Amino acid sequence: MAKKALVNKANKKPKFKVRGYTRCQRCGRPHAVFRKFGLCRICLREMAHAGELPGVQKSSW
């Protein structure tokens, strides 16, 4: 889990737009966040396997 202070800091509107960054809405992780879902790769994978994301399927080839 991310530090609560950093999660709260990321939720504030930055003084300059370029200073803003995305964090996972579920766990607060700052890296590898998919903007479309607002989730990091780990949470996205867990939720997709559990069937909690509509329209997302595990691919196999």
UniProtKB/Swiss-Prot annotation:
Q: Which Pfam families match?
A: Ribosomal_S14 (PF00253)
Q: Could you give one GO CC term from the UniProt record?
A: cytoplasm
Q: Which Gene3D superfamilies match?
A: 30s Ribosomal Protein S14, Chain N
Q: At which positions is Zn(2+) bound?
A: C24, C27, C40, C43
Q: Which UniProt keywords apply?
A: Metal-binding, Ribonucleoprotein, Ribosomal protein, RNA-binding, rRNA-binding, Zinc
Cofactor binding description: Binds 1 zinc ion per subunit.
The cofactors named for this UniProt entry are: Zn(2+)
Q: Which BP terms from GO are recorded?
A: translation
A Gene Ontology molecular function term of the record = structural constituent of ribosome
Origin superkingdom = Bacteria
PANTHER family named among the record's database cross-references: 30S RIBOSOMAL PROTEIN S14, SMALL RIBOSOMAL SUBUNIT PROTEIN US14M
Query: What exactly does this protein do?
Result: Binds 16S rRNA, required for the assembly of 30S particles and may also be responsible for determining the conformation of the 16S rRNA at the A site.
Note the subunit structure.
Part of the 30S ribosomal subunit. Contacts proteins S3 and S10.
> Mind telling me which NCBIfam families this protein's record contains?
PRK08061.1 (NF005974)
State the similarity comment: Belongs to the universal ribosomal protein uS14 family. Zinc-binding uS14 subfamily.
HAMAP family, per database record: Ribosomal_uS14_2_B
Q: Which protein are we looking at?
A: Small ribosomal subunit protein uS14
Source species, please? Mycobacterium sp. (strain KMS)
Q: Highest lineage ranks of the organism?
A: Bacteria, Bacillati, Actinomycetota, Actinomycetes, Mycobacteriales
